Amino acid sequence: DEMGRTQQGNNNAYCQDNEIGWLDWRGLVEVPAVGGARARPALRMSGAEGAVMPDPTLVEFTARLIALRRRYPQLRRTTWLTGAATAIGGRDVVWLNRQGEEMNRRQWEEWGRYAFSFLLGAAAPGENDLMVMMNGEASDWATSLPPGRWQVLLDTVQADGRPDEAMAVLQSRIVLKGRSLRLLE
């Protein structure tokens, strides 16, 4: 889970009144703001002598994901994404192929498609589109970005998800490392 707790393989730990189900809340710390959201508390675990504690970077990464979800309505939609027009004129989602072009039916049906991206249309006036890029392949993937200026909000190459400062703002091309995900605005 978000704190790296395996619960010793027990998926019914809710009924365990022992170390398997307990959380040590003394490790609560404030995680810096992300993408315009205000700072939020997060649990940095510490515990009993000899206890296996989660990686604090995982907790910070999860807090970053939560902050991004709170900040961007596109990441918490309550309806299916269909590609339909939105009330403000764009589309709710546009699926892109490896070259950064809209996917066609044939491409959807190709086996072995492990690198793609999609645009999540702005949910309200004044908001920006988001782009999610996923590379499930072992090799790096170079692709074109849609027109405009893009800022990297999340990069899973970094353990805490923070984008590398040198890659924070992009204009036309991007290289995505193998087995990684990036979120752009």
Regions found by a protein language model. Name each.
Residues 166-185:
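C-terminal beta-strand-rich structural cap/linker in extracellular carbohydrate-active enzymes
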Residues 27, 120-122, 154, 178, ...:
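Pocket-edge structural micro-motifs
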